């Protein structure tokens, strides 16, 4: 039995252009009545679907009845007609704030109009417009408003906006919401770009701002003191930033602030900062820290704005320091034996005072640190009654350590704090080697004559040895379990020895047991003292079992802590070592570098390089060997500083000789002036070499055949290998 299938094609009724568009016109008219608040009910779903379907069907009809292009043109015509016949007349009959309110209303209505018309014509926009590469219906709609409405209104709107902003600057209340909404019209007409906003409004705002604050600066600078002027300037900057927050576009802020800063601060900077009665020097003189902080805040964001303030700061500190030197010199002339000691105390007080200024008023800015240093270098290197600053400082330290502050009888902590402050001053002394020599001699005198405070440095060693003997006896009598390692502790008294860096090192178990045992023992001797462990001074002898032989390694406590980790793991990452030992990155890099990158490579580092990074891994180098069975694995010092232990002049001659030879060995051939300059630079950290002395040392090195003059140019020297 055969089955017959019938295919039925339903043909839609053809919609002519005018017929279909008449339906659309009805919908457009309804939409416009809604926008004009003419009590028109909203679209119901059926009406919306009907309008959408009309456009859809007219776009799908076969040519020549495909009316896509015609509908696209009519869409443009509808929007243009509405803007010309309805929007523009309503705008033209209003002025001032009323015009702005109408502009905001019409812009909001226009966005609604475009959104609804685009929804009705969605199929047209989605396919026909996209295929032809035409401007979207949204773009067509907004271009119409821009060309027909915005272009005619924007200039007047700009003038009204600027007038409102001027009123607010003068203290009047304005409708900020209205201003913000109008600004949104400028931004919205850029269609995602800020060019229109910047050219049509922002540029005029910036010009107006500059003119306004130029007038204010001229009047205020004549009427107000520097502190009062700065208060007003700070308030103006705050209010301008609030304006950006309240109604301007965020991109305007840096430009607006720059204009205000330029007119209120940059243009009048010299007049303001150098004001004789209330400027920077007057604020420093009167200790007006709040005003100085404000001056710093105002000028810190201006390029080179802080330089004149910092220069005056240096000038003021230098003047105060020179006054102290003069007072001390006058007192010394009057046979006041304590003049130099009083000078150091006052210099310390001066340094403490202005360090507070640098930290609090100037937020630790490097420029103020630099110029404070330069100021102190000026007067801290002057002589008083024939005594150099190096000798005066050394004598002050000697008196503190001998008499513990004289009549004040300083505590251990106060003594240490005072000495730290002296060290702060020592940074500014050019002849540090001279200070070291004076200090060494005075220290020897204290020890020889059994003066109180410093003798602790000697007696501590004796007491520490006795304490160690008692500890050994204690272990023999009380410990049922042996510690497993020989453990020696040297106990020193805080306050009479140099301070050392302490860390919260996580000790290996082997060491922890020893430390805890000593703590228990020490608790039986005293319960009023606290032990602070200085691991950086410790030394460990550990056995390394390598493939070829077992070797004794002499290492620091830190190095030992690292190596002992590899008893429990064949391979460890940098992060694992760091977490287990609880060491800083700087300390751990130094340790791992000493064990894997220098002469004795106890550890193998991957990847192989001369630097340590946080991604490196390490493993025990079982193949390591050396001809010696006992080796000392050096740990590079944190800071190497040349110490002068003999006569200063002789030491300087040796230092200059060494510097000259080192420079010439590196450079081979060098002109006289360049050699002298490099030598001065090379030695300036410890002292300022005398130019005449350098010339004499060059001649001496020539006589000893280290250097020779160039045969063609007597002012050029050659290194003799």
Curated annotation (Swiss-Prot):
Report the residue ranges that make up the Cullin neddylation domain in this protein: 651-713
- Mind listing the GO biological process terms from this record? ubiquitin-dependent protein catabolic process
GO MF terms here are: ubiquitin protein ligase binding
Gene3D superfamilies recorded: Cullin Repeats, Cullin, Chain C, Domain 2, Winged helix-like DNA-binding domain superfamily/Winged helix DNA-binding domain
Domain of life where this protein originates:
Eukaryota
**Which family is this sequence assigned to?**
Belongs to the cullin family.
What is the protein name stated in its UniProt record?
Answer: Putative cullin-like protein 1
């Amino acid at each position: 039995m055969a089955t017959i299938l019938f295919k039925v094609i339903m043909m839609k009724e053809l919609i002519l252009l005018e017929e279909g568009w008449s339906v659309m016109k009805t919908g457009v008219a309804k939409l416009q009545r809604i926008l004009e608040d003419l009590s028109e009910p909203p679209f119901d779903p059926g009406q919306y679907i009907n309008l959408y379907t009309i456009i859809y069907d007219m776009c799908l009809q076969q040519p020549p009845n495909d009316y896509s292009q015609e509908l696209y043109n009519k869409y443009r015509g509808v929007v243009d007609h509405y803007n010309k016949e309805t929007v523009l007349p309503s705008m033209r009959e209003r002025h001032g704030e009323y015009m702005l309110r109408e502009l905001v209303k019409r812009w909001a209505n226009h966005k609604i109009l475009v959104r609804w018309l685009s929804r009705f014509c969605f199929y047209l926009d989605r396919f026909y417009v996209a295929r032809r590469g035409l401007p979207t219906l949204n773009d067509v709609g907004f271009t119409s408003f821009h060309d027909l409405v915005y272009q005619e209104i924007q200039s007047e709107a700009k003038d009204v906006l600027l007038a409102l902003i001027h009123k607010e600057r003068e203290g009047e209340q304005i409708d900020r919401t209205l201003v913000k909404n109008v600004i949104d019209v400028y931004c919205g007409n850029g269609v995602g770009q800020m060019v229109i906003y910047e050219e049509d409004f922002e540029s005029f705002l910036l010009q107006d701002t500059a003119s306004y604050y130029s007038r204010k600066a001229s009047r205020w600078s004549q009427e107000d003191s520097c502190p009062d002027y700065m208060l007003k300037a700070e308030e103006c900057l705050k209010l301008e930033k609030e304006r950006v927050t309240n109604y301007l576009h965020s991109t305007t802020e840096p430009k607006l602030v720059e204009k205000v800063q330029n007119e209120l601060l940059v243009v009048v900077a010299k007049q303001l900062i150098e004001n004789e009665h209330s400027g920077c020097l007057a604020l420093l003189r009167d200790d007006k820290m709040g005003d100085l902080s404000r001056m710093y805040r105002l000028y810190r964001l201006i390029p080179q704005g802080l330089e004149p303030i910092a220069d005056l700061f240096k000038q003021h500190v230098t003047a105060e320091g020179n006054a102290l030197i003069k007072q001390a010199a006058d007192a010394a002339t009057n046979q006041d034996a304590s003049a130099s000691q009083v000078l150091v105390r006052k210099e310390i007080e001066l340094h403490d005072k202005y360090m507070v200024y640098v930290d609090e008023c100037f937020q630790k800015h490097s420029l103020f640190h630099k110029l404070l240093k330069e100021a102190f270098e000026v007067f801290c290197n002057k002589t008083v009654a024939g005594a150099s600053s190096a000798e005066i400082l050394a004598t002050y330290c000697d008196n503190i350590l001998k008499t513990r502050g004289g009549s004040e009888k300083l505590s251990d902590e106060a003594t240490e704090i005072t000495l730290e402050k002296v060290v702060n001053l020592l940074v500014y002394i050019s002849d540090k080697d001279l200070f070291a020599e004076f200090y060494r001699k005075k220290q020897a005198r204290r020890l020889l004559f059994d003066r109180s405070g410093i003798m602790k440095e000697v007696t501590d060693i004796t007491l520490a040895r006795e304490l160690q003997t008692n500890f050994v006896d204690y272990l023999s009598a009380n410990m049922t379990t042996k510690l497993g390692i020989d453990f020696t502790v040297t106990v020193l008294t805080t306050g009479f020895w140099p301070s050392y860096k302490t860390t919260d090192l996580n000790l290996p178990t082997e060491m922890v047991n020893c430390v805890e045992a000593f703590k228990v023992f020490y608790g039986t001797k005293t319960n009023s003292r606290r032990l602070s462990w200085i691991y950086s001074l410790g030394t460990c002898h550990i056995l390394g079992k390598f493939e070829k032989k077992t070797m004794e390694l002499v290492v620091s406590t830190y190095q030992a802590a690292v190596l002992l980790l590899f008893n429990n793991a064949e391979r460890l990452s940098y992060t694992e070592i760091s977490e287990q030992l609880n060491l800083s990155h700087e300390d751990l890099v130094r340790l791992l570098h000493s064990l894997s990158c220098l002469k004795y490579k106890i550890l193998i580092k991957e990847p192989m390089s001369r630097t340590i990074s946080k991604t490196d891994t390490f493993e025990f180098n079982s193949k390591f060997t050396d001809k010696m069975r006992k080796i000392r694995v050096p740990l590079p010092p944190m800071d190497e500083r040349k110490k002068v232990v003999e006569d200063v002049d002789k030491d300087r001659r040796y230092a200059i000789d060494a510097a000259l030879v080192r420079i010439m060995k590196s450079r081979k051939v060098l002109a006289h002036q360049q050699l002298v300059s490099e030598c001065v630079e090379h030695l300036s950290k410890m002292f300022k070499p005398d130019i005449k002395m350098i010339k004499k040392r060059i001649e001496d090195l020539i006589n000893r055949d280290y250097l020779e003059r160039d045969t063609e140019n007597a002012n050029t020297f050659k290194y003799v290998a």
